[in-house]
Amino acid sequence: MKTVTVKDLVIGTGAPKIIVSLMAKDIARVKSEALAYREADFDILEWRVDHFADLSNVESVMAAAKILRETMPEKPLLFTFRSAKEGGEQAISTEAYIALNRAAIDSGLVDMIDLELFTGDDQVKEAVACAHAHDVKVVMSNHDFHKTPEAEEIIARLRKMQSFNADIPKIALMPQSTSDVLTLLAATLEMQEQYADRPIITMSMAKTGVISRLAGEVFGSAATFGAVKKASAPGQISVNDLRTVLTILHQA
């Protein structure tokens, strides 16, 4: 299986990489939070742009991206607008969503973008091609905050992302029971062993699913999300605790 290298970070080998989400509402808070995050132990900075209030002003969005790039130049920067239908803060049109991601790609300020699988097949394929033309990696994602589908469906979605040339397919699902967590882990393992030719990221959310955020190296998930301050999704634990557990499992 091939790995994905962003800056000096190799994703898809060794212990799962830690992603943290920054969710500031304006440029001043982007700056102050970036300074606070700089001291934390993580691998990838995800900027959750759906929390940014001045979204209609692309110049303002890119000014904030520039602050993040300058504050943490060594950290890979993942640009993510999470749609309302997949658990994000704001709803925008598909056209606006694609335009925002295109602006991020063209800016040269971001290393990776998050593209939601169910945005529309043609739009997703075009955005992936655009990203790759600018040497920007694509995390293609799907989130369900209500349920966990059958393992076959989980695998089908991850394989579809792979077929759309995503660099890293990602899926996050809400368990209604502990057996749902096992379904997610079994699907991850089957995907990793039988179909994946690149790193994947999977997680089961909430307290019930916490084990999935810790056991990625065992089952085949290449990265996990931790919290520096406020968690961006239910079930995230602090980056310090996360690094400790990931290291213990890696060295065992």
UniProtKB/Swiss-Prot annotation:
UniProt xrefs under Gene3D superfamilies: Aldolase class I
Coiled coil start-end:
none
Which residues are listed for 3-dehydroquinate binding in this entry?
A: 21, 46-48, 82, 213, 232, 236
- Enzyme superclass (EC): lyase
Its pathway is: Metabolic intermediate biosynthesis; chorismate biosynthesis; chorismate from D-erythrose 4-phosphate and phosphoenolpyruvate: step 3/7
* EC identifiers of the protein: 4.2.1.10
What keywords sit in the KW lines? Answer: Amino-acid biosynthesis, Aromatic amino acid biosynthesis, Lyase, Schiff base
The processes (GO biological process) annotated in the record are: 3,4-dihydroxybenzoate biosynthetic process; amino acid biosynthetic process; aromatic amino acid family biosynthetic process; chorismate biosynthetic process
Q: From the UniProt record, list the reaction(s) this protein catalyses.
A: 3-dehydroquinate = 3-dehydroshikimate + H2O
A Pfam family matched by this chain, by name? Answer: DHquinase_I
This entry's Gene Ontology molecular function terms read: 3-dehydroquinate dehydratase activity
Q: Which residues form the active site?
A: 143, 170
Cite the InterPro entries for this sequence: 3-dehydroquinate_DH_AS, Aldolase_TIM, DHquinase_I, Type-I_3-dehydroquinase
Regarding protein family, the annotation reads: Belongs to the type-I 3-dehydroquinase family.
- What job does the chain carry out? Involved in the third step of the chorismate pathway, which leads to the biosynthesis of aromatic amino acids. Catalyzes the cis-dehydration of 3-dehydroquinate (DHQ) and introduces the first double bond of the aromatic ring to yield 3-dehydroshikimate.
**What does the subunit comment say?**
Homodimer.
HAMAP family, from UniProt? Answer: AroD
Q: What is this protein called?
A: 3-dehydroquinate dehydratase
Organism equals Shigella boydii serotype 18 (strain CDC 3083-94 / BS512)
